[in-house]
From Swiss-Prot:
Keywords: Ribonucleoprotein, Ribosomal protein. One of its GO terms (molecular function) is mRNA binding. It comes from Rhizorhabdus wittichii (strain DSM 6014 / CCUG 31198 / JCM 15750 / NBRC 105917 / EY 4224 / RW1). GO terms for biological process: translation. It comes from the Bacteria. GO terms for cellular component: cytosolic large ribosomal subunit. Belongs to the bacterial ribosomal protein bL12 family. This is Large ribosomal subunit protein bL12. Forms part of the ribosomal stalk which helps the ribosome interact with GTP-bound translation factors. Is thus essential for accurate translation. Homodimer. Part of the ribosomal stalk of the 50S ribosomal subunit. Forms a multimeric L10(L12)X complex, where L10 forms an elongated spine to which 2 to 4 L12 dimers bind in a sequential fashion. Binds GTP-bound translation factors. Pfam families: Ribosomal_L12 (PF00542), Ribosomal_L12_N (PF16320). InterPro entries: Ribosomal_bL12 (IPR000206), Ribosomal_bL12_C (IPR013823), Ribosomal_bL12_C/ClpS-like (IPR014719), Ribosomal_bL12_oligo (IPR008932), Ribosomal_bL12_oligo_N_sf (IPR036235).
């Protein structure tokens, strides 16, 4: 039981980017896709249940979709925004599309998008 508690503690200490990388590695190792499971489960939960047609979105994910040929500038900006080290920021930029920030409000998401685009990146908000 102590081993399970240690595992829970270790997983809880992961950053969002580390958790995403872990998820990707587990998907490859086990031959599954977390996105497919979510896509299948989502319609079953509320299909035809009278859900509101237009949901107001108050949290956004800032997704880096490319470096626009200005990789160094984009890496610098990603480091400034996320606080990541050089290697981690470089890995994030090179593995685009990737989330730079998740669950931010609209104003902050727009600000981050503008910063990244000024550095040469292509960005989308989800």
């Amino acid at each position: 039981m102590a081993d399970l508690q240690k595992l829970v503690d270790d997983l809880s200490a992961l950053t969002v980017l580390e958790a995403a990388e872990l998820s990707k590695l587990l998907e490859e190792k086990w031959g599954v896709s977390a996105a497919a499971a979510v896509a299948v489960a989502a319609p079953a939960g509320g299909a035809g249940a009278g859900a509101p047609a237009a949901e107001v979105k108050d949290e956004f994910d800032v997704i880096l979709t490319g470096d626009g040929g200005k990789k160094i500038n984009v890496i610098k900006e990603v480091r400034a925004i996320t606080g990541l080290g050089l290697t981690e920021a470089k890995t994030l930029v090179e593995s685009a599309p990737k989330a730079v920030k998740e669950g931010v409000n609209k104003d902050e998401a727009e600000k981050l998008k503008k910063q990244l685009e000024e550095a040469g990146a292509t960005v989308e908000l989800k």
